[in-house]
Amino acid sequence: MAALTGLWGSFAHVSRAFSQRCFSTSGSLSAVQKMTRVRVVDNSALGSTPYHRPPRCIHVYNKSGVGKVGDQILLAIRGQKKKALIVGHRMPGSRMTPKFDSNNVVLIEDNGNPVGTRIKIPIPTSLRRREGEYSKVLAIAQNFV
């Protein structure tokens, strides 16, 4: 009887361990994906006016579906759809890529020109390597990190 009780106790312990570890309660730390809240950091009229809902990413224009610095995304902002360029995210990236306090984006037009005339925060120097694509965004940036 004691062996049966010991066996049942170990079974209860194992089943409790499996039930606790079968799922994670913390969110995964990824850069920018669908439904991620972002912060518009240029001085465009659409991004600088307050609104009761923050802008959210509704599509990432790459294969993996996770946007990093330099990727284009589609935003839902104030009831409109606008393209944006990611200039900073919260997830720690590769070496020599800074980690920001928020997911920062710059609004761009369909042809790649920025909507605003000034970027309020420093942007990573890793965007300078992609100068041909985003030369006008780099031209309105004041500081680089």
Swiss-Prot record:
Q: Which InterPro entries match?
A: Ribosomal_uL14 (IPR000218), Ribosomal_uL14_sf (IPR036853)
Gene3D superfamilies linked to this entry: Ribosomal protein L14
The residues forming a coiled coil are: none
Family named by the database record? Belongs to the universal ribosomal protein uL14 family.
One example of the protein's molecular function in GO is: structural constituent of ribosome
- Does Cell membrane show up as a keyword for this record? no
Classification via CDD domains: Ribosomal_uL14
Compartmental location: Mitochondrion
Span of chain positions assigned to the transit peptide in the UniProt entry: 1-30
- Which Pfam families does the record match to this protein? Ribosomal_L14
Q: Does the keyword Transit peptide apply?
A: yes
Q: What is the name attached to this protein's record?
A: Large ribosomal subunit protein uL14m
Tell me, how does this one assemble?
A: Component of the mitochondrial ribosome large subunit (39S) which comprises a 16S rRNA and about 50 distinct proteins. Interacts with MALSU1.
Q: Name one GO biological process term.
A: mitochondrial translation
